[in-house]
């Protein structure tokens, strides 16, 4: 994949920009462009430009961005990024949802745990699929839930990702370090072809190929630069004397692992795991309930373009920061959808339970039938029913037997266990 490089200017006309920005139409144009942080190819064909040519518009836009940009140096590699008012607004919204408690008073602890397990699986599977794991999502979930051993390298990659995500929970009190990077990478690559690269940074050149056409998309820094680049990255991530929003820092961390490419293989998986680690460490615990890699997998071309735009446009990290925030937004929406679904299910179950109590069922029986009506695939046993309702097993057995007699439940044996399931009366 190749994208057109923008025009390069030796000098930017800052004074001309500062004069022109006083014009209302120019100011409105830049505000509109800031919303989506347009790249050169989007500016090039944009109608109603306030300058004489697309090239002049781009030159003034570069001046506009330079004036508000924050600078970052890793070794001899200069980077910069802009925190526009629109990015600030998005960050505020993320804070309200990711720290403010999207789950609060909405779904039960058990449902949260169910979704957490599902999200961990999704993240492990999707992160591996981005790197080429061929195993389907359903097969991968079956493997992890059943505990069976992986049958091929694709399945091993998924197991490794799952274990790495779990390991992150144990490392939240640590600062970012070389050991943390090496440990996460080693877990990610065990028993795969990339295992030979574990435990140390590469000592050979790396040419990153495009996942679609196989062409060289990027040449990573020379191996002699890796240690100083990583050291500067660690300093940036760990320092607290200058505040950068955690989502911005995590996005830059994600990008830089991909840019430095410190390992012979497994860089992308490691970068995404460290993105998670940093944000959870900084208090965004709800992030454990969403899968960023699933959002990335579903927009892989945009993911690659975000890297290329950054590199093509004088290492402007804003493109990748914007992409990270969009992926977070998409992933978060999945959680919102799940929460809303659970609310609807609880409301429906409560309505059914109320109607059944009016028909003579006791509250325990009515609640069970209400629950099973929205979870028809679920089953219940005497011990579980007894424990949930705080009653002795004799009473639990009588309740369930009455429901069987009334044709509401079906009793059957699964192995040595007696289970009760809802009778489909549709």
For the regions a language model picked out, list residue spans one by one.
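FIC/Doc superfamily catalytic core
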Residues: 1-265, 269-426
């Amino acid at each position: 994949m190749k994208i057109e490089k923008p025009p390069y200017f030796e000098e930017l006309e800052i004074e001309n920009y500062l004069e022109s920005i006083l014009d209302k139409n120019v100011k409105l144009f830049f505000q509109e462009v800031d919303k989506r942080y347009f790249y050169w190819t989007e500016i090039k064909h944009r109608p109603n430009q306030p300058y004489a040519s697309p090239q002049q518009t781009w030159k003034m836009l570069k001046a506009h961005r330079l004036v508000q940009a924050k600078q970052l140096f890793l070794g001899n590699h200069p980077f910069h990024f802009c925190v526009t008012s629109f990015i600030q607004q998005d960050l505020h919204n993320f804070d309200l949802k990711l720290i403010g408690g999207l789950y609060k008073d909405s779904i039960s602890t058990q449902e949260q745990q169910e979704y957490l397990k599902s999200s961990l699986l999704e993240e492990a599977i999707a992160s591996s699929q981005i790197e080429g794991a061929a195993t389907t999502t359903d097969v991968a979930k079956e493997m992890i839930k059943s505990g069976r051993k992986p049958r091929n390298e694709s399945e091993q990659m998924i197991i490794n990702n799952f274990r790495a995500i779990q390991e992150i929970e144990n490392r939240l009190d640590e600062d970012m370090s070389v050991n943390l990077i090496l440990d996460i990478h080693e877990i990610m690559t065990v028993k795969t072809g990339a295992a030979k690269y574990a435990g140390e940074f590469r000592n050979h050149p790396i040419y990153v190929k495009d996942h679609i056409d196989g062409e060289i998309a990027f040449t990573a820094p020379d191996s002699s630069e890796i240690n100083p680049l990583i050291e500067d990255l660690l300093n940036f991530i760990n320092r607290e004397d200058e505040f950068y929003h955690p989502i911005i820092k995590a996005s830059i961390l994600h990008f830089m692992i991909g840019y430095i490419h410190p390992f012979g293989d497994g860089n992308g998986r490691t970068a995404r795991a460290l993105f998670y680690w940093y944000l959870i460490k900084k208090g965004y615990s709800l992030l454990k309930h969403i899968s960023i890699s699933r959002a990335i997998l579903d927009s892989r071309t945009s993911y690659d373009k975000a890297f290329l735009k950054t590199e093509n446009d004088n290492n402007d990290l804003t493109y990748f920061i914007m992409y990270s925030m969009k992926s977070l937004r998409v992933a978060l929406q999945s959680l919102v959808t799940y929460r809303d679904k659970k609310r609807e299910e609880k409301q429906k179950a409560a309505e059914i339970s109320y109607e059944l109590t009016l028909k003579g069922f006791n509250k325990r029986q009515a609640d069970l039938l209400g629950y099973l009506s929205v979870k028809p695939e679920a089953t219940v046993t005497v011990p579980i029913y007894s424990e949930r309702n705080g009653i002795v097993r004799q009473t639990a057995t009588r309740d369930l037997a009455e429901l069987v007699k009334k044709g509401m439940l079906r009793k059957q044996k699964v192995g040595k266990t007696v289970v009760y399931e809802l009778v489909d009366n549709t």
